[in-house]
């Protein structure tokens, strides 16, 4: 019965191991689980056999006691003294048979106990090996997942930095576009003013003469304004070209932002032809790319 009490903690530990091994997914872990289940069933079968042998010994002891009582009753009934020696001999034979039976049962119980002990040690060794393999596999999986996480984190950081740089560049381009729009408005005003002065000069050629010094100053100011305009145009064109190249080289980075990305749409540039009557009256373009030509006075 002491062996049976030692088996119960083993069953409890086996149930705990079973509960832990439920989460195993690979085939190797399923095989280990099946092996543990088979060992558990063998241990239970051996425990039942051990209990059955104990019960058999108890029943034999009871039967022996009953037979001894019957013998005593028969001796009391058959009280002749002539059979006293025969009764003693019979009693001695029964005692010897009972001792032989006890010896055989003891040997059987010892063999069963040894078998149970060996099975328990084997099961413990297999369970330890299975747990070690499972722990090693968990460590390897955790290491692999951490490495993948680091790679993903580095890639996300790189994409975020690239998007930040693109956003800064877009903001700078928007500022340049706004400056360009202001410059265009200013240039349009200058062209309108030049047109009006041209009409006034054509209407009154004899009554009004422009001083030579004032004309030179006015031309210098106009040349400076046109130079500033064309420098702003070149800066804006370079910014637009660089933005186009950057967006064409990295289409995936911008799509990663999804609906969170900033969609920067520049306002439409005012057309140079918006003042149609001014352009139709002039026979030459307002100014060349060099910024040195002037419209006819």
UniProtKB/Swiss-Prot annotation:
InterPro entries, per database record: CCDC159/163
Residue stretches in coiled coil: 147-297
Top-level taxon in the UniProt lineage: Eukaryota
Keywords: Coiled coil, Differentiation, Spermatogenesis
GO biological process, one term: sperm flagellum assembly
Region listing for Disordered, in residue ranges: 256-297
Assembly with partners or alone: Interacts with DYNLT2. Interacts with GGNBP1. Interacts with OSBP2.
Organism of origin: Homo sapiens
Protein name per its UniProtKB record: Coiled-coil domain-containing protein 159
One Gene Ontology cellular component: sperm head-tail coupling apparatus
Protein task: Functions during spermatid development; may participate in the centrosome reduction procedure of spermatids and is required for the formation of the connecting piece/sperm head-tail coupling apparatus (HTCA) and the correct and tight attachment of the flagellum to the nuclear envelope.
């Amino acid at each position: 019965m002491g062996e049976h009490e030692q088996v119960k903690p083993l069953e409890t530990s086996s149930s705990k191991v079973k509960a832990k091994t439920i989460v195993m997914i690979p085939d190797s872990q399923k095989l280990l689980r099946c092996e543990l289940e088979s060992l558990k069933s063998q241990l239970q079968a051996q425990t039942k056999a051990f209990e059955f042998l104990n019960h058999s010994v108890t029943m034999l002891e009871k039967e022996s006691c009953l037979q001894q009582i019957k013998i005593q009753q028969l001796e009391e009934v058959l009280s002749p003294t002539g059979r006293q020696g025969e009764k003693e001999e019979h009693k001695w034979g029964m005692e010897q048979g009972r001792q032989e039976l006890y010896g055989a049962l003891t040997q059987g119980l010892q063999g069963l106990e040894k078998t149970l002990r060996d099975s328990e040690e084997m099961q413990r060794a297999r369970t330890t090996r299975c747990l070690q393999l499972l722990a090693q596999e968990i460590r390897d999986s955790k290491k692999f997942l951490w490495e993948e996480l680091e790679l993903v984190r580095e890639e996300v950081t790189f994409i975020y930095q690239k998007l930040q740089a693109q956003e800064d560049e877009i903001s700078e381009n928007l500022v340049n576009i706004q400056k360009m729009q202001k410059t265009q408005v200013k240039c349009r005003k200058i062209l309108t003013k030049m047109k009006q002065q041209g009409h006034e000069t054509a209407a009154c050629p004899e009554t009004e003469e422009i001083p030579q010094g004032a004309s030179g100053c006015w031309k210098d100011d106009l040349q400076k304004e046109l130079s500033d305009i064309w420098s702003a145009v070149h800066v804006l064109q370079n910014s637009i070209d660089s933005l186009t190249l950057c967006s064409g080289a990295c289409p995936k980075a911008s799509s990663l932002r999804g609906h969170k990305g900033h969609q920067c749409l520049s306002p439409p540039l005012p057309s140079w032809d918006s003042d149609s009557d001014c352009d139709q009256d002039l026979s030459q373009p307002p100014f060349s790319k060099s910024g040195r030509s002037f419209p006819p006075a």
